């Protein structure tokens, strides 16, 4: 048996053993049907009920009280439970060496502060989760079809709200597992069944990491872009090196295989 996810080591062992995950807690913080007689209970209530049940069955040998650190949410101070959910990711682990090479072409001011970036990159071991379950931000331009086995991607360059709009006719339909393009939505829509729009939004840094591309005219003014990119300078604080700077360099490397800036002032 492997305990529920508590840290990176739990995830690593779970994957190494090839175990099949299951979800015992739902998004409302209640136990799922997998908990049997404790289904529907809040987590704290279920823990108390399990102890009472084991005591009734005479299966508790000894109870020892110990102090324990419990992670809580920043604002509500409520206990945090890790729940396994499907999210959208951008691949990044495969390109770390190339980002380091490209960072070598950037002049950092002062030079020693480049180490903030390199230290952060040493700790990257998973891909970048870019989807968030929030109410307000840039919507992820995706719809699900054919009982979730296919995804519909909006064409480049437009803004859509999938939770309230239908896919444009020239959207691409992809197999969800293989990511292979099947065809255009306009031609396939009669065979796709119910269409469900994505309700999740992008991580804020997914937008912010476009800043150097946007100001340089990427995709809109390519003549200007050829002259203006890499952007001359990025001035910023050290506390967002791991987010704003790193994700901007990541996106520049993934899209263009170029350094995002000529100078970085931290």
Where are these regions (language model features)?
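Residue patterns forming the tRNA-binding/recognition surfaces of aminoacyl-tRNA synthetases
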Residues: 1-148, 244
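Conserved active-site neighborhood of enzyme catalytic/cofactor-binding cores
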Residues: 2-6, 29, 104, 116, ...
């Amino acid at each position: 048996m492997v305990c529920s996810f508590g840290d990176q080591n739990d995830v690593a062992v779970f994957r190494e053993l090839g175990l099949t995950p299951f979800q015992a807690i739902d998004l409302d913080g209640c136990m799922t049907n997998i908990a049997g007689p404790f289904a529907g209970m809040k987590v704290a209530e279920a823990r108390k009920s399990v102890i009472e049940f084991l005591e009734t069955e005479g299966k508790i040998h000894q109870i020892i009280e110990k102090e324990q650190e419990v992670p809580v949410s920043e604002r509500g101070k409520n206990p945090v439970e890790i729940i396994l959910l499907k999210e959208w990711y951008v691949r990044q682990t495969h390109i770390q060496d190339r980002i380091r090479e490209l960072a070598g072409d950037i002049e950092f001011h002062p030079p020693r502060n480049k180490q903030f970036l390199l230290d952060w990159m040493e700790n990257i071991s998973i891909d970048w989760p870019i989807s968030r379950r929030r109410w307000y931000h840039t919507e992820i331009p995706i719809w699900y079809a054919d009982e979730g086995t296919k995804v519909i991607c909006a064409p480049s360059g437009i803004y859509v709200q999938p939770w309230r709009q239908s896919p444009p006719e020239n959207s691409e339909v992809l197999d969800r597992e293989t990511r292979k393009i099947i065809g255009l939505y306009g031609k396939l829509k009669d065979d796709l069944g119910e269409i469900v729009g994505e309700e999740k939004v992008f991580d804020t840094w997914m937008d912010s990491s476009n800043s150097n591309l946007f100001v340089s005219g990427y995709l809109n003014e390519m003549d200007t872009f050829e002259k203006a990119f890499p952007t001359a300078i990025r001035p910023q604080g050290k506390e967002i090196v791991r987010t704003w700077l790193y994700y901007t360099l990541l996106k520049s490397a993934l899209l263009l295989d170029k350094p995002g800036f000529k100078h970085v002032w931290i």
